[in-house]
């Protein structure tokens, strides 16, 4: 196990910041947004989201229990070599995670959302929580969020849900777009 994986498992954050050089340009941005995956189940989805967060300078929060270990081969493969550029925090449960974001605007992303994700004005201080792939966010979390902060990504009638990593990408890029893609692109 690599050192940064041990730190993540122990609930610590790991952030490797690098800068541009004449020969090589690597990722470096101040973290902008926070994404929470509540009890994620499928390792490749989380791996893709790790890569997405590294590329958009978003912080990723995972709420236990997880449906995999952080050494899972599929998770590591999907994230390619971006794991070292992501800021990841593992929370023991929802109460701990919720406390961490007390006082900030929390958006629950759900097929049950009443507000379309693209009809909301976002700030870099906003937090976005996504539920597990097989069942979505529990009523406890949905009920704790103001109705206008329960957002959805539209789909054609009869569709059940989007892939988790796709839904995170759609929402995160809208949030970043609204900020004017505030980091260098």
Q: Which residues are covered by each model-predicted region?
A:
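Post-transcriptional modification and biogenesis factors for structured RNAs
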Residues: 2-185
């Amino acid at each position: 196990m690599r050192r940064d994986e041990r730190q993540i498992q122990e609930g610590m954050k790991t952030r490797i910041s690098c800068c541009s050089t004449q020969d090589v340009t690597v990722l470096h941005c101040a973290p902008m947004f926070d994404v929470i995956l509540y009890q994620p189940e499928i390792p490749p989805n989380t791996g893709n989201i790790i890569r997405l967060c590294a590329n958009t300078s978003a912080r990723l929060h995972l709420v236990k229990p997880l449906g995999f270990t952080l050494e899972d081969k599929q998770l590591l493969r999907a994230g390619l070599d971006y794991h070292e550029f992501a800021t990841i925090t593992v929370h023991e449960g929802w109460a701990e995670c919720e406390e961490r974001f007390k006082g900030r605007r929390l958006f629950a992303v759900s097929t049950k959302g009443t507000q379309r994700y693209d009809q909301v004005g976002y700030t870099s201080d906003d937090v976005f929580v996504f539920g597990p792939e097989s069942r979505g966010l529990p009523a406890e979390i949905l009920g704790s969020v103001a109705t206008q902060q329960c957002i959805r990504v539209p789909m054609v009638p009869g569709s059940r849900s989007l892939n988790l990593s796709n839904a995170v990408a759609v929402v995160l890029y809208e949030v970043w777009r609204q900020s004017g893609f505030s980091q260098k692109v």
